[in-house]
C-alpha cells in the first residue's frame, strides 16, 4: 500500500489483476487491471492487453476491442503492441457491421507494421476471406495495393481479384478494360495456374471481339497449354474459337482439325447449351 494515501500501488494492483486472470477470475481481473491504467507506460499497456483478454473470456467483445485498441496505441513494448494490434483487428472483424470496413484497415495496418509477425499468416487469411466473400473487388484491389509487403496468399487473392474484374468488364462489353485486368492477372499468375489459364481464355475472347485475331489465337493456345482442366466446356470452346479464327484466315485444313477436336470434346461432355455452341454462326 501507498502509506501516505492508503491506496494500493499500481504494481501491486497489476500483479493482483494478473493473478485473477491466471486463475480465470476474469471479471475481477478486468476490474482490477482497469485501476492500473492511470499512467502512459508499459504497465498500463500490459494491463490493457490483459483486460482485453479477460473481456474476450467474458464474451464482451466490444469492451475487449476498446482495451486492445488502447494497448496497441502504446509503443512502450512492441511485443505487447503486436499482440494487442492483432487482437484488436480480430475483434473488429468479428464485431463489424460492415462486411468491408474498419477490420480491413486494421488488418492492413497490422501487416505493414508487423510484416514478419507470427500472426501475419492468419491476418492474411482473414483479409483474403473478406476480399473473396464480399466481392468488393475494386475495394479489395486498393486494399492490397496499400500493403507494403503482401504475402503469397494475398498476391494469389490479387491474381484472382484481377481476373474477376476482367470477367466483369467482359460481361459489360468493355473488352479493352477486360484485357487490362486480365493481363495484370496473368502477369502475377505464378500463384494459381488455373486462374492464369482462365485469364488467357478470356483474353482470347476479348481479342476476338475486338477483331484482333492474331492475339486471340495466341491466348487461346496459351490457355490450352496451361489449363489443368482439359475436359470442360471452356477447353472445347477454345478449340471451337481457334477453328473459326483459322476459317477466317482461309486456313481450312487447320480449321477442320480444330472443329473435329471440338466435336470430339463436345461428345465427351455431359452438356453444352445450344446457344453457346452456335453463338458465332
Residue ranges with predicted function:
Residues 26, 61, 98-100, 137, ...:
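TPR-repeat structural position
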